[in-house]
Amino acid sequence: MANQLVILNVYDMYWMNEYTSSLGIGVFHSGIEVYGREFAYGGHPYPFSGIFEISPGNASELGETFKFKEAVVLGSTDFMEDDIEKIVEELGKEFKGNAYHLMHKNCNHFSSALSEILCGKEIPRWVNRLAYFSSCIPFLQSCLPKEWLTPAALQSSVSQELQDELEEAEDAAASASLASSASGSRTGRHTKL
């Protein structure tokens, strides 16, 4: 299926906007929707991808502090769904969880990078205005705790990634144990499995 719409889903971080809207700065989370899937980025303390997937437009998957604001059609793409998965995987090497920075590498930077690849367009500037203003007003960054901006969906994704790594380690240990047991049985030892 070619010529798929590329949609920017924008979420209002309304609890923060109560404070920043009087300054004319909105604080938004964003993700890119294509092929009925939405990809976004968030921070965590680990050196693997911070990119995660949610149901398009579903703010509840991000957590109670987010609400859906609007969908912006950015263009269309001829990439197939498999290609997009590979692109997102490659972007995950750059957008690692521990590389997240509220002002310099946030969800909106990711959305813009993915959009540029898929349809050749950046996201609208108003979506990431906070990052722009923070470069002009450095103390602004210290006013916004980074941990407030880790979506619940990403926390779930990180937990799953860590669980997968734990299972892989357990499988490797079990395989090593079986190999050891197998070599032990050749030497006359009896091992109960």
From Swiss-Prot:
Residues 165-193 are annotated as: Disordered. GO terms for biological process: proteolysis. It is found in: Cytoplasm. The keyword Cytoplasm applies. Residues 172-183 have a biased composition (Low complexity). It is an enzyme of class 3 (hydrolase). The active site is at 29, 107. The keyword Cell cycle does not apply. Residues 4-148 form the PPPDE domain. Its main location: cytoplasm. Its EC number is 3.4.19.12, 3.1.2.22. PROSITE patterns: PPPDE. It comes from the Eukaryota. Has deubiquitinating activity towards 'Lys-48'- and 'Lys-63'-linked polyubiquitin chains. Exhibits palmitoyl protein thioesterase (S-depalmitoylation) activity towards synthetic substrates 4-methylumbelliferyl-6-S-palmitoyl-beta-D-glucopyranoside and S-depalmitoylation probe 5 (DPP-5). Belongs to the DeSI family. This is Deubiquitinase DESI2. The gene is DESI2.
